């Protein structure tokens, strides 16, 4: 009986080969798959907000709320990896690894990153408006209050606000950046573990643990925030400029560092550098 998983070196080679395929993918397919990835991550975010919406107000410990939020969110990345789609944060690992292994180009990276980022945003905002707000799922309490707290914590740039009767501090630019570094380090490891596994159950567990960890810790994922913060915008608690300037820019940059440096570069150096 053969092994059901790849060695770390073979996994690095497989990721490099995937980068080559992404380099050659037709633009139209990348656009569709990027829209789907944004929607899939948004589904995970919507599920997490629904199941935890009233927990803080009901007096549950903050750690338990984070645990439940993190436990259900990984369904989004499971859909991305197993059903197939183009997720910007995963591409922050794939494309640099392919470039270092001479199987992808800088121009291919730029095309892939820009396309996946833009259409991840389109897919996530689509779910935020049409499936979370227009449906009424997140417009009634306690879910509206919970969704607004999540969005404000991420997007108010260090300002304080009242949530569940308590003063809550939002993230500063630097905090958002470093939380994003940690986030995509773990997200890309989740993708790496999924590629390492040759069966679907192994892929599911390989994804679940690192994604659960990043969410429960409180790290920042750019594509997830393309859902969480627009929900807050549609509910009237945050502005588009606050979204981009205070969160999406630093979190995107931090996600690039986390995936490209701490996963792609280090595993290329360890397993692929000749």
UniProtKB/Swiss-Prot annotation:
Record membrane topology: Multi-pass membrane protein
InterPro entries in the cross-refs: Aquaporin-like, For/NO2_transpt, For/NO2_transpt_CS
Record's keyword annotation contains Plastid: no
Cellular component, GO annotation: plasma membrane
Alphabetical keyword list: Cell membrane, Membrane, Transmembrane, Transmembrane helix, Transport
GO molecular function, one term: high-affinity secondary active nitrite transmembrane transporter activity
GO biological process, one term: nitrite transport
Alphabetized PROSITE patterns for the sequence: FORMATE_NITRITE_TP_1, FORMATE_NITRITE_TP_2
Chief site of localization: membrane
Its job: May act as a formate transporter.
Protein's name according to its UniProt entry: Probable formate transporter
High-level lineage: Archaea, Methanobacteriati, Methanobacteriota, Methanomada group, Methanobacteria
């Amino acid at each position: 009986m053969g092994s059901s998983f790849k060695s770390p070196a073979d996994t690095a080679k497989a990721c490099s080969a995937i980068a080559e395929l992404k380099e050659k993918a037709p633009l139209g397919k990348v656009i569709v798959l990027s829209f789907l990835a944004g929607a899939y991550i948004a589904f995970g975010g919507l599920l997490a907000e629904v199941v935890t919406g009233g927990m803080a107000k009901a007096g549950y410990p903050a750690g338990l709320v984070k645990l439940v939020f993190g436990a259900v969110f990984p369904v989004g990345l499971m859909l991305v990896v197993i059903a197939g789609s183009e997720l910007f944060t995963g591409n922050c690992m794939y494309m640099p690894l392919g470039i270092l292994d001479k199987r992808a180009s800088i121009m291919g990276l730029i095309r892939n990153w820009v396309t996946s980022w833009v259409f991840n945003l389109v897919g996530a905002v689509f779910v935020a408006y049409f499936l979370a707000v227009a449906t009424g799922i997140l417009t009634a309490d306690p879910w509206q209050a919970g969704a607004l707290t999540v969005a404000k914590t991420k997007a108010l740039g260090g300002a304080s606000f009242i949530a569940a009767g308590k003063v809550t501090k939002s993230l500063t630019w630097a905090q958002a950046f470093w939380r994003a570094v940690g986030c995509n380090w773990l997200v890309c490891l989740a993708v790496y573990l999924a590629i390492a596994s040759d069966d679907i159950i192994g892929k599911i567990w390989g994804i679940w643990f690192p994604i659960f960890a990043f969410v429960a810790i409180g790290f920042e994922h750019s594509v997830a925030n393309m859902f969480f913060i627009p929900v807050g915008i549609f509910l009237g608690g945050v502005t588009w400029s606050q979204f981009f300037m205070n969160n999406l820019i630093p979190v995107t940059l931090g996600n690039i560092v986390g995936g490209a440096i701490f996963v792609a570069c280090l595993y290329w150096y360890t397993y692929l550098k000749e």
